[in-house]
Design a protein with these regions (language model features):
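A glycine-rich phosphate-binding loop feature that marks nucleotide/adenosyl-phosphate handling sites
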Residues: 345-357, 413-416, 462-464
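ATP-dependent adenylation/pyrophosphate-handling site
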Residues: 192, 347-351, 355-396
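Generic recognition of stable, solvent-exposed alpha-helical segments in well-folded globular domains
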Residues: 23, 69, 178, 206-210, ...
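Secondary-structure transition/capping motifs at alpha-helix termini
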Residues: 217-218, 338-345, 366-378, 388, ...
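Enzyme catalytic cores with a strong preference for nitrogen-chemistry domains
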Residues: 1-350, 366-375
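Active-site adenylate/phosphate-handling loop in enzymes that bind or generate adenylated species
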Residues: 114-117, 123-151, 160-162, 173-176, ...
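A conserved beta-strand->alpha-helix junction
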Residues: 261, 292-310, 373, 377-431, ...
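Short, ordered loop/turn segments at secondary-structure junctions
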Residues: 47, 196-197, 227, 383-386, ...
Length: 506
């Protein structure tokens, strides 16, 4: 796991017993025993040691003392090398706080305190809890004669992996500037939320988008663990909606299991943070405490993360068509603007019958419609060579006829054979010289025709080819305007299909 930068996280929902910390301790430990052995972080729901719906029982010192004692007992029984985040109420200097204890290797690393205490609609937490903003500076909590920091401005940095954890509690996410945002600015790349989010109509979808979008804004992983249906249903219902997201993508979401896992790619997140520097500019200048801990590297991993072979292609057909048409419009608008700026009404494009040149021709056609140009100004040139098949040649001609563009066929065979004689190359030797000579001959034809027509050459190469260097230097890598340069190969076909689908619907 360390070697591949993946950090395995889990979110758990408990069968909670209201006001019974001992019973909840057994449930927490049972869940931990069920975790996969390579799990590095587990997050439990808000106030899970007591239950979220204790209401005025939170005033009882018997419950509060029992909750604190149970926390100590859980810490002693935790397995090695597992960061465990547990919710409980804590009385500190005659005030009650909604807290999360961050535990590791039989120790409490710190106490994160809830900042935003809701008191609206179905929530009335201010009846019992104080905000972290009421904490005195440098407040601590004693465990084993050690002073543990208590704050809402703490991050927990693993010196072995590149994981840096930031914790927030339920409502802290739902406000204008979430606590996790300042955590991210302080370096946290794995954000955890202990929640007790109830169910009302459409709230699940809003919550899903909230967690997903926050992970994107913070360039972070986000582990969201919520209270489940065994909380009191006197006036609220909880479903245990757990989510694990990464940089705007949902890695896992509760279906039926009470435990979900997500492998967060820390290297990817850290790379994005280096790249998008403006998002990491801290304008708040909040003083943070960084608590360091050292985990053991996990060498054996069972990789179960889904990797999409077509990351740029939406699975939903309607969404895919909308995206592809949007891309086509962006391409066409770019070319249309360039043609308008240089006062040019003619383009030259090489057509092979393949995907890339087909898309480029469609882009030219759309651009000419935007500028209200005559499509005959699109000079589509087919240049058959030694390897041209009847099928690709036929496809190219059909497309050009359908679009009513100017078409012309120029064979490169004689020109390339003469070139082989000039450079003393045997045409029976099919090496790189044989291949590149044909590509350069085609480019020469296109460039010369662009001069003849007072036009520009439109390039057809796509992003994948450019990234891999899959083009001929001084050949098809050259053009005046390359419309496919930002389109990956896996998306090209779908843009063409999307345009065709749209035409059929109209």
């Amino acid at each position: 796991m360390h070697r591949y930068s993946y950090y395995k996280t889990a979110a758990c929902t408990l069968n909670v017993s209201i006001g019974d910390p001992q019973a909840n301790k057994e449930e927490i430990l049972k869940c931990i025993q069920e975790l996969d052995s390579d799990t590095q972080l587990v997050v439990f729901p808000e106030l899970c040691i007591t239950g979220y719906t204790c209401q005025d029982l939170f005033y009882e010192h018997t419950l509060l003392n029992s909750a604190k004692q149970v926390l100590f007992e859980i810490v002693e029984e935790l397995p090695e090398n597992l960061v465990t985040v547990i919710g409980l109420p804590l009385e500190i200097e005659n005030k009650l706080y909604n807290c999360a204890a961050i535990c590791f290797n039989h120790d409490i690393l710190g106490i994160q305190v809830k900042t935003y205490i809701p008191s609206y609609n179905e929530f009335y937490e201010t009846r019992w809890f104080s905000s972290a903003s009421e904490l005195k500076e440098n407040t601590t909590f004693t465990y084993k004669n050690k002073k543990v920091p208590v704050s809402n401005h703490i991050v927990f940095k693993d010196t072995t992996t590149s994981a840096c954890l930031g914790i927030e509690i339920c409502e802290d996410l739902w406000v204008t500037i979430p606590v996790s945002s300042t955590h991210a600015l302080a370096g946290a790349n794995v954000l955890c939320n202990l929640s007790a989010s109830n169910e009302i109509i459409s709230k699940a979808n809003y919550r899903r988008n909230l967690v997903k979008d926050q992970s994107a804004k913070c360039y972070a992983g986000y582990v969201y663990a919520s209270a489940g249906p065994t909380e009191s249903s006197s006036d609220l219902v909880f479903s245990g909606h757990n989510l694990i997201c990464e940089n705007g993508a949902i890695l896992n979401e509760t279906k039926t299991d009470k435990i979900i896992y997500g492998q967060i790619d820390l290297d990817h997140l850290n790379h994005d943070r280096l790249h998008y520097k403006t998002s990491m500019q801290d304008l708040f200048h909040v003083n943070y405490t960084t608590v360091e801990f050292t985990s053991k590297p996990i060498e054996e991993i069972e990789f179960d993360r889904y990797i999409d072979a077509y990351p740029f292609v939406p699975n939903n057909q309607d969404e895919r068509i909308v995206r592809c048409l949007e891309i086509l419009h962006i391409q066409a608008q770019g070319l249309a603007t360039r043609l308008s700026k240089i006062h040019c009404k003619d383009v030259v494009i090489g057509i092979s019958g393949g995907l890339d040149s087909t898309l480029a021709l469609l882009v030219c056609h759309e651009a000419f419609k935007i500028n209200n140009y005559d499509s005959k100004g699109i000079h589509a040139i087919t240049m058959p060579g030694f390897g041209t098949t009847k099928r690709t040649k036929s496809n190219a001609q059909i497309l050009m006829d359908l679009l009513h563009v100017s078409s012309e066929e120029i064979s490169i065979v004689d020109g390339v054979n003469q070139h082989f004689k000039d450079i003393h190359h045997d045409p029976e030797v099919h090496n790189i010289t044989y291949e590149n000579s044909q590509a350069r001959e085609r480019t020469q034809i296109l460039m010369d025709l662009s001069n003849a027509y007072n036009a520009i050459v439109v390039g057809t190469g796509d992003l994948s080819e450019l990234a891999l260097g899959w083009c001929t230097y001084n050949g098809d890598h050259m053009s005046m305007y390359a419309v496919n340069a930002s389109v990956p190969k896996t998306l090209v076909r779908y843009i063409e299909i999307g345009r065709a689908s749209c035409r059929e619907r109209v």
